[in-house]
């Protein structure tokens, strides 16, 4: 008989539903919801800073796909044995991002490359964009952590604390029973009660979101320093959470790889905060250029045509003026010769 402590947090009975043959995964829905929230918040903040509304969505067309690819690459690279080891899941599972597994550092790094490309095309300073989107990113991470809750993953060791998370055995369609069965449905039997480390990180991310908003409003942070503050603050929380996690991960000297990454990135973020210019960018620099390269070329061509016409008019004026003077002089001479005088 299974004894259930009502004080514990129960896991969801399942993390995937089916709409006919199409699987609807809670993890994917959480990722999408996080991205939408980040874009809405980022767009409003960009407009408040003096930028054009809607620009954030244009940049996202580059940044989001790059970020998803980068996040998955980082996850696979730091968990190589799971996919390509002796008993690995294979390349099919390696690209199945909808089943969970995104590394934030890869997402930020490659997403930053996509954002840089888009900002360069629009003539927008990348640091200003990063500051506008930073609070939205950390909130998106918090929302995304809910996906780990549905997957019963990213947890810590056993605990008897009242906020411990109950992990249920799940049975898949083929009858397989396992705690980490992403496609299964709960049997109702509790396998163990553990630290919900994903929840700890979720709460930390929400706190960082609030702090970034408050600090930015009070001190008018710019030039990429607010984004660096987000990175530094996130690293602190991630480092602490990594110390509590017990799920399999690549380690160096008994330390999880994400702990090393968090430390190095934290140092870099703090250095940037100290060295970057103070204050905020001039709103006039956030206007950028039209999103369409063709539109920009048409504008330039129109201006060039106008300049050419002005030049031709000037040249015609210089050439025609002497001819007009000569004609007037000829008429005057004819009038004098004929004795005609105006009275």
From Swiss-Prot:
GO biological process: lipoprotein biosynthetic process
Biased composition, class Acidic residues, residue ranges: 295-325
Region (Disordered): 283-343
Pathway in which this enzyme or protein is active: Protein modification; lipoprotein biosynthesis (diacylglyceryl transfer)
Gene Ontology CC terms, in alphabetical order: plasma membrane
Annotated keywords: Cell membrane, Membrane, Transferase, Transmembrane, Transmembrane helix
Enzyme class: transferase
UniProt-listed Enzyme Commission number(s): 2.5.1.145
One Pfam family recorded for the sequence: LGT
Main location per the UniProt record: membrane
Entry's localization field: Cell membrane
Family: Belongs to the Lgt family.
PANTHER family: PHOSPHATIDYLGLYCEROL--PROLIPOPROTEIN DIACYLGLYCERYL TRANSFERASE, PROLIPOPROTEIN DIACYLGLYCERYL TRANSFERASE
UniProt name for this protein: Phosphatidylglycerol--prolipoprotein diacylglyceryl transferase
Gene (name only): lgt
């Amino acid at each position: 008989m299974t004894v259930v402590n009502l004080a514990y947090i129960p896991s969801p009975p399942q993390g995937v539903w089916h709409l006919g043959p199409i699987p609807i995964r809670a993890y994917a829905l959480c990722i999408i919801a996080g991205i939408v929230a980040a874009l809405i918040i980022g767009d409003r903040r960009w407009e408040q800073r003096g930028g054009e509304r809607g620009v954030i969505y244009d940049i996202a067309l580059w940044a989001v796909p790059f970020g998803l690819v980068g996040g998955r690459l980082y996850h696979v690279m730091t968990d190589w044995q799971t996919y390509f080891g002796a008993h690995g899941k294979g390349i099919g599972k390696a690209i199945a991002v909808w089943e969970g597994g995104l590394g934030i550092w890869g997402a930020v790094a490659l997403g930053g490359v996509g954002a840089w490309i888009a900002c360069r095309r629009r003539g927008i300073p990348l640091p200003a964009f990063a500051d506008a989107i930073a609070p939205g990113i950390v909130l998106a991470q918090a929302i995304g952590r809910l996906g780990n809750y549905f997957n019963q993953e990213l947890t810590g060791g056993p605990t008897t604390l009242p906020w411990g998370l109950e992990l249920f055995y799940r049975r898949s369609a083929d009858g397989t029973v396992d705690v980490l069965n992403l496609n299964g449905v709960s049997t109702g039997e509790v396998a163990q009660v553990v630290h919900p480390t994903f929840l700890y990180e979720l709460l930390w991310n929400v706190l960082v979101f609030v702090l970034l908003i408050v600090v930015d409003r009070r001190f008018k942070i710019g030039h990429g320093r607010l984004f660096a503050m987000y990175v530094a603050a996130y690293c602190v929380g991630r480092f602490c959470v990594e110390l509590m996690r017990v799920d399999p991960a690549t380690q160096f000297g008994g330390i999880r790889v994400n702990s090393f990454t968090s430390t190095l990135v934290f140092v870099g973020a703090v250095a940037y905060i100290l060295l970057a210019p103070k204050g905020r960018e001039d709103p006039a620099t956030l206007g950028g250029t039209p999103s369409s390269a063709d539109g920009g070329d048409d504008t330039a061509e129109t201006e060039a045509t106008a300049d050419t016409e002005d030049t031709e008019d000037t040249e015609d004026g210089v050439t025609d003026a002497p001819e007009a003077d000569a004609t007037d002089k000829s008429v005057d001479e004819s009038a004098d010769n004929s004795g005609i005088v105006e009275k």
